[in-house]
Amino acid sequence: MNRIQQTFQTSSAPFWYAQLELGFCYENSRTIMSHRKHYGPVRVQKMLWPEKTGVCHAIIVHPPAGIAGGDHLTFQIETEGQAHAVITTPGAGKWYRTNGKQAFQHIYLNVKDDSILEWMPQETMLFDGALAHSETDIHLEQTASFIGWDMLVLGRQARAENFVQGSYHNQFKLWRKNKLLVADTLYFEGGDRWLSSCLGMNNQAVMASFWAVPPEKFRSSFYLEQHIELIRELIMRMDVPVTLTLLEDVLCARFLGNDVRRCHDAFAAIRAKLRRYWFDLDEEFPRIWKT
């Protein structure tokens, strides 16, 4: 029997504490949401099944549309055997200018054997004056597969805003069976020389990372080297500032530039190729991206 729980509480505190737990399993030839629990202003807006294979597309929404000083936002998501979930957001996330308090986001993803999770939130904007702390922990079992990304935009580009005050701290860890495969840590403060240095952001406003872990049968160097060369050819044709590397059997792409739409298009194209190579699936972009 499916277990779906929902809770909602409000608080008079001048900050938000919000948490969303989601669980996905495979039942009756499609992926379903078997567990849902939320606290505060974060929830699933919609679930769709646009693919013939029964992949579940879920849209998660945080009604305040951003994280302010003192806020804590937590996501806990799990996929079970044979489930395939695609998770995205309806629009850009935001780290707002702070009131002097730190803001936090925690993301915990648990991908069990034979399941697939695609974690594809839209970009996050870092407002000048934000104090942002973000942590992402991804745990894969041996035969689990994962595709995900993180896109950060410094300042509000429409206002030509730069990040001159505040700080940003991001920690990303990807594990498989308690073995650490990837560990990324980034910290900078507003106005840091690193933001303008050619060894850092080089005066660019958009920085993004893409990670992908294939099914077990495609983890040999024979397959991975073929696939990464095909993706390099794609990136060259698109003429976008993306670099590709392999960290053991994790494919990693990095974007550094000024146009977040070009970043999104590049990562979406890489994701589409990997879906075809690894899962024999069409690209099937989330419909919310077209609105």
From Swiss-Prot:
Function comment: Required for maturation of urease via the functional incorporation of the urease nickel metallocenter.
Gene name of the encoded protein: ureD
Complexes and interactors: UreD, UreF and UreG form a complex that acts as a GTP-hydrolysis-dependent molecular chaperone, activating the urease apoprotein by helping to assemble the nickel containing metallocenter of UreC. The UreE protein probably delivers the nickel.
Keyword Nucleus: no
Species in which this protein is naturally found: Acinetobacter baumannii (strain ATCC 17978 / DSM 105126 / CIP 53.77 / LMG 1025 / NCDC KC755 / 5377)
Protein family: Belongs to the UreD family.
Official protein name in the record: Urease accessory protein UreD
InterPro entries listed in its UniProt record: UreD (IPR002669)
Compartments reported by the entry: Cytoplasm
